[in-house]
């Protein structure tokens, strides 16, 4: 009789464990790189997931080293979700040659990540945070500069500035100059946080920017067109371990609610609210999600 009871209890325990597994994990870990945009995106993901699922989110925000430390942690299962950029995945992680077509890039990086790392890319958010070149409004009007090709015709009269890393990157200064035949009057190294001040003070004429920078819409800043598409696309999207998706049916559909929902203008505005107006990323994320009707 005792043996029968013990067998019954053992069977019930196994059944309970199986049911628990089928219900999925209770917690997922969301990470971000140490930059304003990533803090906002991580908050958007956190609030969306907690509103639309029964999952509890643990945040690991501002991880030093960014992709170089987050990616191995995802492979090891220490991190489940984080926002990434197509160009970073393709060029930095996979070490592949640049692809100018954004859709081809997305397709190839998605396939490679799934095959090599068992990591899934969501659809792209919509915005493209790539490199760009900015000049002052006065310079743009004085020289009639609208494109990089326009800039090339007068580059010998202008001073170019970028952060030190840009001069060292394979896809940075030297290759850019070669493609467009720039012959700048002078070049300067400048801290990434001082670029816009340098442009405003007329210390330099051209600066490198990221195309979702908080200050990119300032009145005196003009972004010129990369008319030969030198810079690779860096479209934002969510990365998630496939194991987590397998354990939580429906989670991918929740992440897909952000597909094509964040334009460059919207990302710039959110970055501006946090960096310049000092708003809490949690508040900015919540306002965005409510405006889009994605949470109540």
Task: Please report, for each region that a protein language model flagged, where it lies by residue.
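A local structural motif
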Residues: 51-62, 157-159, 177-190
């Amino acid at each position: 009789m005792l043996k029968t009871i013990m067998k019954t209890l053992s069977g019930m325990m196994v059944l309970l464990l199986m049911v628990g597994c089928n219900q999925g994990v209770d917690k997922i870990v969301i990470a971000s790189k140490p930059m304003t945009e990533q803090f906002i995106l991580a908050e958007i993901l956190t609030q969306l997931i907690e509103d639309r699922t029964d999952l509890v989110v643990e945040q690991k925000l501002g991880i030093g080293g960014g992709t170089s430390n987050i990616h191995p942690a995802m492979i090891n299962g220490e991190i489940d979700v984080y926002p990434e950029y197509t160009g970073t995945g393709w060029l930095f992680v996979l070490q592949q040659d640049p692809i100018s077509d954004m859709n081809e890039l997305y397709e190839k990086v998605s396939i490679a990540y799934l095959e090599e790392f068992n990591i899934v890319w969501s659809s792209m958010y919509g915005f493209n945070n790539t490199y760009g070149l900015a000049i002052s409004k006065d310079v743009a009007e004085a020289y009639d500069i609208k494109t990089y090709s326009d800039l090339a015709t007068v580059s010998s009269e202008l001073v170019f500035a970028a952060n030190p890393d840009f001069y060292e990157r394979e896809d940075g200064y030297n290759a850019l100059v070669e493609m467009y035949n720039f012959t700048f009057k002078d070049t300067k190294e400048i801290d990434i946080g001082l670029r816009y001040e340098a442009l405003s003070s007329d210390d330099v004429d051209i600066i490198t920017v990221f195309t979702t920078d908080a200050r990119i819409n300032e009145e005196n800043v003009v972004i010129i067109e990369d008319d030969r598409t030198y810079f690779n696309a860096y479209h934002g999207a969510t990365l998630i371990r496939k194991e987590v998706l397998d354990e939580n049916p429906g989670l991918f559909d929740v992440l897909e609610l952000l597909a094509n929902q964040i334009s460059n203008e919207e990302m710039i505005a959110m970055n501006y609210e946090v960096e310049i107006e000092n708003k809490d990323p949690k508040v900015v994320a919540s306002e965005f999600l409510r405006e889009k009707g994605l949470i109540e």
